């Protein structure tokens, strides 16, 4: 039996999945192993291999059944898997700088390895859940977490770009001045831009920008007693329960996302828009409210595009590994 493995290498943990040729995932939920990436590439690659042996056992297959491996990591990295000298958190060991993780893992496992960054892997998973692995459709995914990740899939293929920065959707500027109720707000992103999507639609945006802006309007609010980075973690749950301040925060996030999606509709004319990430890992009622607010934030669409579907990405924790596996499955089919 031929299977493909997906390996989602995070800063502290590696998440695995196994998929067969029928596009069935053989591991339900999370299969995690410590990454130890802080100790450098050699230790981390050994961890990836050790965890893979545990994953195949859990999936009920053997290591020899693996015909290809899909890997994803946080960026910045080239489209072929060479990690940037400006490594992300936990990839700070000197040996990671300029390290070709795809080629090195391929040599270690003696199998072809494909590479995506974690945002693009999540986007491919979201696309697959709607259209399957052999699709020719186009979709745009926004993944709302600590930052704003995501990706663009054009005619079934991930847009990686010349240097691997395709789909860095968080740093696309949006005309936020048109959002109601935020006069005088100047949302700044850690990248140096003012008014990109991440500066308004992320956990970081809640802590740095939106809570400090809205809290003075609610002087007796229970979140006022926390510092904003701690308070930010309560906003989603309170918004889901209907708290007016927290709904205001999520309304601004949804309207910013709507402005961004409008730009994507005009650029790609996609078949679907997809929202993922921890921000909307909520009950269905709140997800429906958030989608409706996102549509409300979009400028009026052409009649032909007005009914573009907006989906919620399922299986948030496993999205990276599953997207990476789909990329490797597509590779094996193209050979």
How would you label these PLM feature ranges?
Residues 4-8, 65-70, 139-143, 149, ...:
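Short glycine-aspartate micro-motif
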Residues 36-49, 65-69, 75-138, 183, ...:
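Glycine-rich phosphate-binding loop and adjoining helix at the ATP-binding site
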Residues 3-50, 84-88, 164:
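Short glycine-rich, Thr/Ser-proximal phosphate-binding strand/loop in the N-terminal lobe
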Residues 193-272, 306-308:
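A mobile "lid/hinge" subdomain adjacent to the ATP/sugar-phosphate binding pocket shared
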